[in-house]
Amino acid sequence: MDPLRRETLLAAAAALLLRPFAALAAWNKEAFGAKSAADALKTLGIASPAPSKDIVIEAPQIAENGAVVPIEIQSNIPGTTVLTVVIEKNPFPLNSRFTFREGALPFVKLNVKMGETSAVRVIAQAGARSYTASQEIKVTIGGCGG
């Protein structure tokens, strides 16, 4: 193999391997490490989200196993660019945060881990405003070491 081609391939491979680290730089360690939902939201700059029926949460009312609880979330609020999922009674309440480009469908389907019966709260951000909706899920067998 030509040495120049080998160097080019190695440089391209290194660039691809380092790309995931750029995503880690955006991770908010303080928010995801917060022990209360209020502290996590405060760290994210979310003050008082307004209740909204335009955030749809589809989840089971009762989860037999808290280790895998399926949830679907969709925001019908125009201009939604961020969805944040908070599980109030988990050891680390901030579960996930999704960012969408303008015009994208703000929809996610995920499996979450729940330690006990808790409210699952979703905060949608559209422009400078925040909106929230929640649903309680009863857990019979905890998934966070319970």
What is each PLM-predicted segment?
Residues M1-R19:
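N-terminal secretory signal peptides and thylakoid transit peptides that target proteins
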Residues A26-I62, S96-F98:
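Transition segment at domain starts
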Residues P70-N76:
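Short edge beta-strand/loop segments characteristic of extracellular beta-sandwich folds
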Residues K89-M114:
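An anionic, turn-rich surface loop/hairpin at beta-sheet edges
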Residues G115-A119:
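Extracellular Ig-like/FN3 beta-sandwich strand-entry sites
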Residues G127-A133:
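Short acidic/polar inter-strand loop motif in beta-rich domains
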Residues E136-G142:
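Short beta-strand edge segments in extracellular beta-sheet folds
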